[in-house]
């Protein structure tokens, strides 16, 4: 995995965090690694939640520098809602990437398969996924849902799992 180039703005903090000296800040989520960060904005820049900003090595238009990594509990209610929306957008935009991850997931140990970590996936569904994977790799979320007979949407399960990982609720990481 390379360096992240883009991020989505989750919330704008005109006065930064209470424990931060930076005046204008914004909470962002990287589009690739899904890391949450607090960034200082350039002078006279105001950003809106949902805006995709460049944070790579070259000239940045909105972001001055990265202040620190943050956890979802540092976000306001609006920031948390925006995080859920942005994760859904990222999962939708990167369908090929996440289906490829599902096609490659293996066992964690003798008793636990990585697929079991996805919300809504139990032992029977894991067996069905493994069986279908041997026939042919999954090509899309729709293909996965149809072939496995998954009652909920796999994209939603991926979103939920990403949120669990960001909240630090599990020691095993699949997507973050």
Q: Across the structure, where does each feature detected by a protein language model lie?
A:
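Conserved hydrophobic/aromatic packing and binding residues within compact polymer-binding modules
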Residues: 126-129
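Small-residue hinge/turn detector
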Residues: 122-123
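Structure-specific DNA junction-binding interface
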Residues: 1-93
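C-terminal extensions
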Residues: 90-117, 131-176
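Generic detector of intrinsically disordered, low-complexity, polar/charged segments
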Residues: 4, 13, 117-119, 165
């Amino acid at each position: 995995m390379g360096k992240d180039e883009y991020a989505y703005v989750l919330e704008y903090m005109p006065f930064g965090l209470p424990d931060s000296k930076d005046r204008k800040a914004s909470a962002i989520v990287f589009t690739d690694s899904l890391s949450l960060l607090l960034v200082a904005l350039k002078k006279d820049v105001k950003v809106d939640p949902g805006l995709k900003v460049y944070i790579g090595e070259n000239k940045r238009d909105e972001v001055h520098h990265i202040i620190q990594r943050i956890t979802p509990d540092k976000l306001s209610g609006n920031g948390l809602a925006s995080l859920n929306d942005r994760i859904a957008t990222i999962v939708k935009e990167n369908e090929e990437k996440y289906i490829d991850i599902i096609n490659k997931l293996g066992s964690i140990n003798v008793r636990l398969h990585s697929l079991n970590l996805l919300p809504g996936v139990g032992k029977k569904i894991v067996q069905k996924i493994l069986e279908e994977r041997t026939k042919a790799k999954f090509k899309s979320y729709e293909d996965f849902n149809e072939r496995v007979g998954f009652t909920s949407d796999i994209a939603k399960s991926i979103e939920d799992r990403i949120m669990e990982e960001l909240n630090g609720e599990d020691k095993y990481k699949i997507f973050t």
